[in-house]
Swiss-Prot record:
EC annotation from Swiss-Prot or TrEMBL: 3.1.3.1, 3.9.1.1
Subunit structure comment from the entry: Homodimer.
Keyword Magnesium in record: yes
General function of this protein: Alkaline phosphatase that metabolizes various phosphate compounds and plays a key role in skeletal mineralization and adaptive thermogenesis. Has broad substrate specificity and can hydrolyze a considerable variety of compounds: however, only a few substrates, such as diphosphate (inorganic pyrophosphate; PPi), pyridoxal 5'-phosphate (PLP) and N-phosphocreatine are natural substrates.
A Pfam family hit: Alk_phosphatase
Protein name: Alkaline phosphatase, tissue-nonspecific isozyme
Top EC class for this record: hydrolase
Record: residues binding Zn(2+) 2: D337, H341, H454
Residues modified to Phosphoserine: S110
SS bond partners: C139-C201, C489-C497
Glycan attachment positions: N140, N230, N271, N302, N430
Signal peptide (from-to): 1-17
Length: 524
């Protein structure tokens, strides 16, 4: 048994030794604060240029506690204490909070939230691209209740559009950009009930290829949902679970190819080598399906077959940026959510760090003068870290104390519920007896569940670029796409555009903006 006094003594020594010398000088903190103040004062001159490009980064399940833990991890991966590190999203000048509830759920799911931040209306949990008049699983409540997304609005305005995700391309988040479904789980017709099929509802993979036929870039997982039932997967030939699922016998990849104009350059790729061999500036349409289901966790990724999120984002921007009218790109770090559901904090946080790297890559390829970039989450998780850990403590390490009840150590990271609930001999498992630094270690939880749940608290919204100042304070989640549309002069937000101009030219003044906003029904 570890002595609590020994743990406390070690923690005290570590705390003293890990304080950087410069931080002991008050001048360091005063100078830092003064520089931050100067940066804030510069924001008084608002950037009201008309947006050419819109990039939305969605960290699925990336609540504020995940953002903070990812920040520390990023720093520690660079051999720093971690707490002082800045994520790319930390550098964005405008921050707001988003209220994530669904119309019928206090703690939301990823489908109803995706409908909110992509389509501009709140919806029921489990439904995508439809209003709250649609009931989950009830196909006959879909017709007439469809709502369109910012991706559709951008495409209708002449912009190029793209979707990049680390989940299936027909998963909850991306599907709200193009599909209208009473159930997020209708990935292919194989997952649909006979009643829904007989009533004429289409699966989400089918809708991906048919609803918005000219999406320029689609990258992620989900290969098996595009091919006929039992068709062998190109990569996992012996894996029955990787085989095609479609009961209708359709080859949606071939259908995707058939919809593309002959004079355009269209490419379907299924591995990283094929992707990186392409000249993106010579590609008009790209479909990349790199796994039968979701893509692998970043820590498990096969660098030969699976591209990283950063690589996919870079290629997507190169393809989309050829359009002089600009583009809309949705990027999802989707497996942050999966890591948390499995109680595998290390997997989740490495996914978040990789998404932050992709944010940096996108920032280096675009300009704040004409590109609005938004980073947010659909919901949070019951994930936390604490325990009075000293500065520089490994984010996956032990707290510097033991429980004053069972006298056992505990990791700083814990979950409110989930699969990490472990009882050994009638008592809480002693974490010092297991490898709590393992990639797949499941952090302890207070309540036993097979899958950890979402959290219901607000999530952060980070914004930079033209009109980013419209994201401030606390907003309903469905407000977000209205800001993007207003800034880019697309969709229904066109009244102010005649006197507005593109980046670098004269812009509508603050008074004009204040007069224009009420017509959009926007409340602050």
């Amino acid at each position: 048994m570890i002595s609590p006094f020994l743990v406390l003594a070690i923690g005290t020594c570590l705390t003293n030794s890990l304080v950087p010398e410069k931080e002991k000088d008050p001048k360091y903190w005063r100078d830092q604060a003064q520089q931050t103040l100067k940066n804030a004062l510069r924001l008084q001159k608002l950037n009201t240029n008309v947006v050419k490009n819109v990039i939305m980064f969605l960290g699925d399940g990336m609540g504020v506690s995940t953002v903070t833990a990812a920040r520390i991890l990023k720093g520690q991966l660079h051999h720093n204490p971690g707490e002082e590190t800045r994520l790319e999203m930390d550098k964005f000048p405008y921050v707001a909070l988003s209220k994530t509830y669904n119309t019928n759920a206090q703690v939301p799911d990823s489908a109803g939230t995706a409908t909110a931040y992509l389509c501009g209306v709140k919806a029921n949990e489990g439904t995508v691209g439809v209003s709250a008049a649609t009931q989950r699983t009830q196909c006959n409540t879909t017709q007439g209740n469809e709502v369109t997304s910012i991706l559709r609005w951008a495409k209708d305005s002449g912009k190029s559009v793209g979707i990049v995700t680390t989940t299936r391309v027909n998963h909850a988040t991306p599907s709200a950009a193009y599909a209208h479904s009473a159930d997020r789980d209708w990935y292919s017709d194989n997952e649909m009930p006979p009643e829904a099929l007989s009533q004429g509802c289409k699966d989400i993979a089918y809708q991906l290829m048919h609803n918005v036929r000219d999406i320029e870039v689609i990258m992620g997982g989900g290969r098996k949902y595009m091919f006929p039932k039992n068709r062998t997967d190109v990569e996992y030939e012996m894996d029955e679970k990787a085989r095609g699922t479609r009961l209708d016998g359709l080859n949606l990849v071939d259908i995707w190819k058939s919809f593309k104009p002959r004079h355009k350059h269209s490419h379907y790729v299924w591995n990283r080598t094929e992707l990186l061999t392409l000249d993106p500036y010579g590609v008009d349409y790209l479909l990349g399906l790199f796994e039968p289901g979701d893509m692998q966790y970043e820590l498990n990724r096969n660098s030969t077959t699976d591209p990283s999120l950063s690589e996919m984002v870079e290629i997507a921007i190169k393809i989309l940026s050829k359009n002089p009218k600009g583009f809309f790109l949705l990027v999802e770090g989707g497996r942050i959510d999966h890591g948390h559901h499995e109680g595998k904090a290390k997997q989740a946080l490495h996914e978040a760090v990789e998404m932050d790297q992709a944010i940096g890559r996108a920032g280096a390829m675009t300009s704040v003068e004409d590109t609005l970039t938004i980073v947010t989450a659909d919901h949070s998780h019951v994930f936390t870290f604490g325990g009075y850990t000293p500065r520089g403590n490994s984010i996956f390490g032990l707290a510097p104390m033991v429980s004053d009840t069972d006298k056992k150590p505990f990791t700083s990271i814990l979950y409110g519920n989930g699969p990490g609930y472990k009882v050994v001999g009638g008592e809480r498992e002693n974490v010092s007896m297991v490898d709590y630094a393992h990639n797949n270690y499941q952090a302890q939880s207070a309540v036993p569940l097979r899958h950890e749940t979402h959290g219901g608290e607000d999530v952060a919204v980070f914004a930079k670029g033209p009109m980013a100042h419209l994201l401030h304070g606390v907003h309903e989640q469905n407000y977000i796409p209205h800001v993007m549309a207003y800034a880019a002069c697309i969709g229904a937000n066109l009244d102010h555009c005649a006197s507005a101009s593109s980046a670098g030219g004269p812009s509508p003044g603050p008074l004009f903006l204040l007069l224009a906003l009420p017509s959009l029904g926007i409340l602050f």
